[in-house]
Amino acid sequence: KLRGLGYEPGLAEESVFTAVKAPVFSFAKLSTVDTFLSPEMKSTGEVMGVDKDHRVALYKALIASGLYIPRGGNVLIATGEWDREDCIALSKRFSRLGFRLMAVEDDHNHLTDAGLLAELVPEDSILDFIKTDKVSLVLSTHAKAGVPGRLGFAIRRTSMEYNIPCLTSLDTANAILDVLEHLAECGEPDIYALDEYSRYDRKNG
């Protein structure tokens, strides 16, 4: 019995740490698959980030999953029509962090109408911008996920093939902005070995 091993019944004490799990996908091995997530997609594994702050835990999980998060540079915005209004506030946050905005025509018009400074990227030059490292981060929520002939599919696949982080959801983008704003204010996170977490938890629990 568990009691004979020294375990007591009931719930464990709440930890001072937050753990965030992130899925890992094998997009690099599947050349015709869109990176825009859909309900039928399955991850090939999971990783976990742990920290006292949930934003840092997310940051660690994303890094472990292979998603590099740049601290600056050019962010390319290519969203669906339904996302453009919400994208304005998000773009302002990117600008405050020092990112330079780049956008396809419809997004560019929407951003400039809102008073934001953004560079217009011609549609026939978008993939070249990604391939030549002129873009540090991509936000692509174009519709018709999985359709090879669509611009959104081409942007997402090219970003993946050239190791440019590509976000396909405004919720994810906002969460990553929370992380970047926290790191800008508080600096780099602490890194612990796994056994150090249990010792810290007992000491501070």
Residue ranges and their predicted role:
Residues K1-L167, A173-I176, H182, C186-P189, ...:
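ATP-dependent carboxylate/acyl-activation modules
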